[in-house]
Regions:
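Hydrophobic alpha-helical
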Residues: 95-99, 103-123, 189, 203, ...
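Hinge/cleft segment of the Venus flytrap/periplasmic-binding protein
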Residues: 39, 173, 177-181, 192-193, ...
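Extracytoplasmic "Venus flytrap"
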Residues: 42-61, 65, 69, 75-91, ...
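Hydrophobic alpha-helical segments within soluble ligand-binding/sensing domains
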Residues: 89-90, 145-170, 184, 213-215, ...
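Short, solvent-exposed amphipathic alpha-helices that sit
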Residues: 54-68, 152-159, 180-199, 213, ...
Length: 338
């Protein structure tokens, strides 16, 4: 596999060198991207599940960016099986990509521990890998691009303290166990809440980033505990589930999400959600593609292995700062901050 990838890269570089000679002779320079379809770079992009709007957006922006660059056969890989993210399915997809002989892989692993061996197998086959959103620390990947999810959790915690000046009991809905964003967002939130005494997390349970599970978890929590002063969720999908229950039961409580999905921006605008955290998933996926392509074509290894975009808190006061604000119909001028 390494030989196949290197042959393709050598051929592309040969075309570039020939172009330089042609340019010196006054001839038109060819694109640095291979023109013929059979010379295209084959890049696979794997996500835990396209049943999550977050990953749909990430995939769409990556595919759009690959098309803009040109010379790339973009291969989308959906890791869900039977309607849910599956490490087994994602592993099988990677095995198929090794057999197919792709040139590079961008992946957001469903479970970082479960996918680590499969990702290492891809690397051992001579295929460079860039992780996006979810980092795998024990595997020798080319690079990782993500958001600072610990800081995102801190933003949620600081906002809770701001809107609850007299304190209060808060429910927390955590994300999928084993997913680094879920782990990091909880850590950031816990760090801020633990540093003061007024706001307390009295219920902290996983709803696995899923709206339907959030409905069940929140209903169960309400049945056994006093009404919370606020609810903080590790993603917007869970916040939507909480909002659904709150509306059905006539509760008026601040609900804080994470991801800045268009539906969340609309909900913040109409008052059914209080805030969300923007982590610029489109910025993450396009930067991951850029790093991989630059390595494949130019042998450029990033100076830093990890690239983290700085998340921002989105409330009704700054809706236009969200990456998908225009899509949501609330304006937009966001620029990802590294």
């Amino acid at each position: 596999m390494l030989e196949k990838t290197m042959n393709r890269r050598t051929m592309i570089k040969g075309a570039m060198a020939a172009g330089a000679v042609a340019g010196a002779a006054g001839m038109a320079l060819p694109s640095v991207r291979p023109a013929a379809a059979q010379d295209n770079l084959q890049i696979a992009f794997s996500v835990p599940g396209l049943n999550f709007p977050f990953f749909v957006h990430m995939m769409n922006l990556a595919e759009q960016h690959a098309a803009e660059l040109g010379g790339i056969d973009f291969i989308p890989l959906d890791g869900q099986q039977n309607g849910a993210p599956s490490s087994t399915k994602q592993t099988a997809d990677l095995e198929a990509m090794i057999a197919q002989g792709i040139d590079g892989l961008v992946i957001s692993p469903n479970d970082v521990a479960a996918l680590a061996p499969a990702i290492q197998s891809v690397i051992d086959a001579g295929i460079p890998v860039v992780t996006v959103d979810r980092n795998v620390t024990d595997v020798n990947t080319l690079a990782h691009v993500g958001a600072d999810n610990v800081e995102g959790g801190r933003l949620q915690g600081r906002y809770l303290i701001e809107i609850l000046p007299d304190g209060g009991d808060v429910y927390e809905l955590q994300g999928q166990p084993g997913a680094t964003p879920a782990i990091d967002r909880h850590a950031g939130l816990d760090e801020v809440i633990a540093a003061q005494d007024a706001v307390k997390i009295v219920v902290s349970q996983t709803a696995e980033f899923a709206r339907d599970k959030a409905v069940t978890v929140f209903e169960s929590a309400l049945a056994g505990n006093p009404e919370p002063a606020a609810v903080v969720c590790a993603n917007d999908d869970m916040a939507f589930g909480v909002a659904e229950v709150a509306q059905a039961q006539g509760l008026s409580i601040p609900i804080i999400g994470f991801d800045a999905l268009p539906e969340a921006l609309i909900a913040i605008n109409d008052g059914s959600m209080a805030a969300t955290v923007e982590q610029f998933p489109g910025g993450q996926s396009t930067q991951a593609i850029d790093i991989l392509v630059d390595y494949l074509l130019n042998d450029v290894t990033p100076a830093e292995h990890d690239t983290y975009l700085t998340p921002i808190l989105i409330t009704k006061d700054n809706l236009s700062a969200a990456e998908r604000a225009v899509e949501a119909g609330v304006g937009g001028d966001a620029t990802p901050a590294a």
